[in-house]
Amino acid sequence: MHSARQKLLSTLAHKSFRLGEFKLSSGGTSDYYIDCRTTTLDAKGSRLTGEVFFEEIRQRGWKAQAIGGLTMGADPIVVAVAVVSGELDGFLVRKAEKQHGTGQRIEGFREKGARVVIVDDVCTTGASTVQAIEAAREFGFEVVGVMCLIEREDAKGRPNVEKAAGAAPFVSIFTANEVRKEHMLQNDDTEPSIFAAAAACEVCGRLAVTNNPRPRCEAHKV
């Protein structure tokens, strides 16, 4: 029987990973894109996300009281973990304080001094994760752990997150490379145009997504 972790990886590779040419929020470009929300907002994917995150938190012995992150990438993860755990409360961090009503930036769980875990879906530059860490500490939470569903190692966001996290460990459930490999395995037999070999596009040198009739990337395929 496949573990929840393996099932989650398989779901991410199938539902959330795409090859092509994409512009990133950092301003750079990439030959792949990951939209975690197609998995974390999926009925089965949400349950798997909650199970995997909660098990990791439990195994690490962080003794957290709540879990939260910057809206909106973290939102479905926070809800999934809260529901699956039955014991961790959730909070959401607004990108800016409300300009009306209570004017608060932290929504949901608001117990100062509480031990909390910060979560995010994809860590690229780490900017959204860092914002959430800073907002949580400014409010009065004790950040005991930081987690992301997928870490894009090529973007080198880990040092930024680790600097902001301080003594709190930063844990990624999967790397983008792991998801990419699983995606290639899933499509190896059913989509011959997508192959796992590290072939380069003969036009621009990017990773090829087809070898029929020539090795080409998404932008230059015939």
Each model region followed by its residue ranges:
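Short, glycine/charge-rich flexible loops or terminal/linker lids adjacent to PRPP-binding catalytic cores
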Residues: 78-117, 124-130
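Phosphate/pyrophosphate-binding loops at sites that engage ATP/ADP/AMP, CoA/4′-phosphopantetheine
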Residues: 53-64, 133, 137-139
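PRPP-dependent phosphoribosyltransferase catalytic core
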Residues: 2-11, 134-197
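Active-site-facing substrate-recognition patch
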Residues: 1-60
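Cysteine-rich micro-motifs
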Residues: 211-222
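Short cysteine-rich clusters marking metal-coordination/redox-active sites
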Residues: 201-204, 217
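Short metal-coordination and nucleic-acid-contact micro-motifs, chiefly zinc-binding Cys/His arrays
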Residues: 195-200, 213
